[in-house]
């Protein structure tokens, strides 16, 4: 006691009494923590003050980590055309390791953008197109040959008349092809070939 400087008041003497008697709830004091600005209930003669203060300071640090993480996410997405509205979620967020597990969290929920299909458009290759164009005349000639054979069986004069009309229509089409190419452009396969117009139509021999 002699080492203490200054007069000793009765209130100071009561603080050094051994805690033998039962603790009275009326002796509950509120000590202010000037560092964090919080009020912590403590009991004189108890060692729970340090653990209580440590737990509250740890929880306060967790709150600060949560707020800093959310603000950093909003700053990253600012100016990118993303909605920065905080939407409350019922479930804890994935990055809530340093936050309370029994609190209410808000996390930025981005709008789901429609997924664009990057699959290439299926187009017909040039080889298959040429093959199909070459197969059309063969099919037409085969059908015409079958029709001509049936006409020959029915009568010679009818077959000759039908063949004459078909050949005249074909020659007329050959004359009109150059004009049609300028009005209606078609595939390069047809344009590369120079089509010479037929100047005179030779008369068909009558048998």
From Swiss-Prot:
Keywords: Virion. Disulfide bonds: none annotated. It is found in: Virion. Pfam families: Corona_I. CDD domains: embe-CoV_Protein-I_like (cd21662). InterPro entries: Corona_nucI, N2-like_embe-CoV. GO terms for cellular component: virion component. Belongs to the coronavirus I protein family. The gene encoding this protein is included within the N gene (alternative ORF). Structural protein that is not essential for the viral replication either in tissue culture or in its natural host. This is Protein I. It comes from Bovine coronavirus (strain 98TXSF-110-ENT).
């Amino acid at each position: 006691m002699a080492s203490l400087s200054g007069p000793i008041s009765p209130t100071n003497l009561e603080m050094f009494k051994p805690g033998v008697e039962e603790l009275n709830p009326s002796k509950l004091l509120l000590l202010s923590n000037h560092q964090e600005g919080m009020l912590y209930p403590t009991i004189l003669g108890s060692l729970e003050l340090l653990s209580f203060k440590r737990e509250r300071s740890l929880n306060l640090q967790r709150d600060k980590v949560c707020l800093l993480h959310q603000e950093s996410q909003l700053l990253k997405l600012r100016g990118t055309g993303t909605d920065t509205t905080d939407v409350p979620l019922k479930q804890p967020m994935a990055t809530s390791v340093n936050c309370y597990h029994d609190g209410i969290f808000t996390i930025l929920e981005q709008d789901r953008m429609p997924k664009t299909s990057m699959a290439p458009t299926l187009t017909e290759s040039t080889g298959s197109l040429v093959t199909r164009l070459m197969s059309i005349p063969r099919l037409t000639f085969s059908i015409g040959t079958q029709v001509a054979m049936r006409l020959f069986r029915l009568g010679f004069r009818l077959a000759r008349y039908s063949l004459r009309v078909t050949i005249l229509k074909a020659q007329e089409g050959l004359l009109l092809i150059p004009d049609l190419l300028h009005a209606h452009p078609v595939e390069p396969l047809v344009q590369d070939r120079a089509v010479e117009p037929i100047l005179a139509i030779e008369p068909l021999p009558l048998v």
